[in-house]
Amino acid sequence: MSQAVNAKKRVFKTHSYRGVDLEKLLEMSTEDFVKLAPARVRRRFARGMTSKPAGFMKKLRAAKLAAPENEKPAPVRTHMRNMIIVPEMIGSVVGIYNGKAFNQVEIRPEMLGHYLGEFSITYTPVRHGRAGATTSRFIPLK
């Protein structure tokens, strides 16, 4: 009976990015992460980082430091939808502007290498009515 219990041991998925475990990614510098990333991300970082993303990263670090132990940090709002998610941002809460409101998104390991704008949709998806010619037909009042 004890062998049956041992056989059903639960295995939890550990996240990795291009073969590198999450623990190593968190210790990794942004320059080392960029070497793992696809060409579009490498090109973007090769062109240099302006002061706006650097200021945003500083605000994220401050929010993480100010957060109590085992609590989510305060959301940091941004209009920078073209910011690429790097390992340093994992665990942060970001308010991403979609043109109307700030959508709060918690940065998870699966989001690495993607743009912030991908997680804050800018339009309302269409909800179609009844299909066919019956929609324009006159409906008499009783």
UniProtKB/Swiss-Prot annotation:
- By its UniProt entry, which InterPro entries does this protein fall under? Ribosomal_uS19 (IPR002222), Ribosomal_uS19_CS (IPR020934), Ribosomal_uS19_euk/arc (IPR005713), Ribosomal_uS19_SF (IPR023575)
Identify the domain of life.
Eukaryota
Cystines in this chain: none
Q: Which GO terms describe its molecular function?
A: RNA binding; structural constituent of ribosome
- Major location (coarse): cytoplasm
Q: Where is this cross-link: Glycyl lysine isopeptide (Lys-Gly) (interchain with G-Cter in ubiquitin)?
A: K24, K35, K64
Q: Which GO CC terms are listed, alphabetically?
A: cytoplasm; cytosol; cytosolic small ribosomal subunit
**Protein family:** Belongs to the universal ribosomal protein uS19 family.
On subunit structure and binding partners, the annotation says: Component of the small ribosomal subunit (SSU). Mature yeast ribosomes consist of a small (40S) and a large (60S) subunit. The 40S small subunit contains 1 molecule of ribosomal RNA (18S rRNA) and 33 different proteins (encoded by 57 genes). The large 60S subunit contains 3 rRNA molecules (25S, 5.8S and 5S rRNA) and 46 different proteins (encoded by 81 genes).
* PANTHER family associated with the record: RIBOSOMAL PROTEIN S19P FAMILY MEMBER, SMALL RIBOSOMAL SUBUNIT PROTEIN US19
Q: What's the protein called, per UniProt?
A: Small ribosomal subunit protein uS19
